[in-house]
């Protein structure tokens, strides 16, 4: 199991919670239930992604899980629109530990929390001990939000967990990118593949940024997309991706990466690139190293609830 530290939580309470969120997020809140979580995003008026999240319905409250540094940004953003709604937003602190688990490898631990594991993408289970959410993708991952880590002794679990680098790489290999404060309001959902990953419901009503996001979707194919590339070399903080196609050369930022120190495995990165033809080539550039070749990989997203 992996300890996930790069996360924060916001709780939204009050009689208008669902109606309020429906006008602020890209997913359809009507599809949120005690057994089904939602993945989505909050956007600004220009259609740029402020934050992404997982939503869980816990009783009458909605719990929003996001990246470190984003909870206060989300609270501040949503509070601006909550003036005329009966809702309260607060930073959630009750989850003392968040774990990443594999459904098969960690089944013995997981069944101590619940007899019935979430099976489908975004299925969830809520108990007095923890919240379990099945992460979309082919690798059968679950997030476990623990209320009280003192129960570890009762469950026969030690406190020595793997670091989250491996978990982050699984996200990268699936083509999932999460918004940090550095990426907030920089990119459209389409450029981040959020439409392909099921984070945008095009059949729901209006929400902040919806008009621009829908126009981009119905206008036709995207010119740029989040892309997965593999490297035999280590990726650095200042690394950039060089894309060459004929006489055209473009430079793109590395949005997130995970290095491998095992010779049998490649390092991996995500970057927003021009839609490539078969003739395009890619390389990694940094201020201190020579260019290194990159291999473009195809991405296949799980089919969730993408409205047409």
Regions found by a protein language model. Give the residues of each.
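Basic, glycine/lysine-rich polyanion-binding surfaces/domains
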Residues: 1-308
């Amino acid at each position: 199991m992996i300890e996930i530290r790069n996360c924060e939580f916001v709780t939204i309470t009050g009689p208008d919670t669902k109606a309020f969120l429906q006008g602020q997020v890209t997913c359809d809140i009507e599809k949120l239930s005690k057994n089904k979580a939602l993945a989505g995003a909050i956007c600004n008026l220009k259609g740029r992604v402020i934050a992404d999240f997982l939503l869980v319905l816990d009783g009458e409250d909605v719990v929003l899980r996001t990246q470190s540094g984003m909870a206060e940004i989300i609270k501040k953003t949503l509070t601006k629109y909550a003036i005329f709604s009966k809702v309260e937003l607060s930073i959630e602190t009750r989850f003392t530990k968040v774990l990443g688990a594999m459904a098969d490898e960690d089944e013995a631990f997981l069944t101590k929390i619940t007899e019935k594991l979430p099976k489908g993408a975004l299925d969830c289970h809520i108990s007095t001990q923890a919240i379990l959410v099945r992460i979309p993708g082919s690798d059968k991952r679950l997030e476990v939000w623990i209320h009280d880590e003192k129960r570890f002794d009762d469950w026969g679990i030690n406190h020595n967990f793997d670091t989250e680098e491996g978990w982050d790489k699984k996200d990268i290999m699936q083509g999932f990118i999460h918004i940090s404060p550095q990426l907030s309001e920089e990119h459209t959902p389409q450029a981040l593949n959020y439409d392909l990953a099921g984070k945008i419901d095009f059949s729901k009503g209006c929400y902040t940024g919806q008009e621009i996001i829908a126009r981009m979707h119905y206008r036709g194919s995207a010119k740029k997309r989040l892309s997965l590339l593999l490297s035999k070399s280590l990726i650095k903080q200042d690394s950039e991706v060089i894309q060459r196609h004929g006489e055209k050369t473009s430079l793109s930022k590395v949005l997130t990466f995970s290095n491998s120190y095992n010779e049998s495995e490649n390092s991996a990165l995500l970057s927003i690139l021009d839609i490539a033809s078969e003739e395009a080539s890619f390389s990694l550039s940094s201020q201190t190293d020579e260019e290194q070749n990159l291999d473009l990989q195809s991405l296949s997203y799980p089919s969730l609830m993408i409205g047409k």
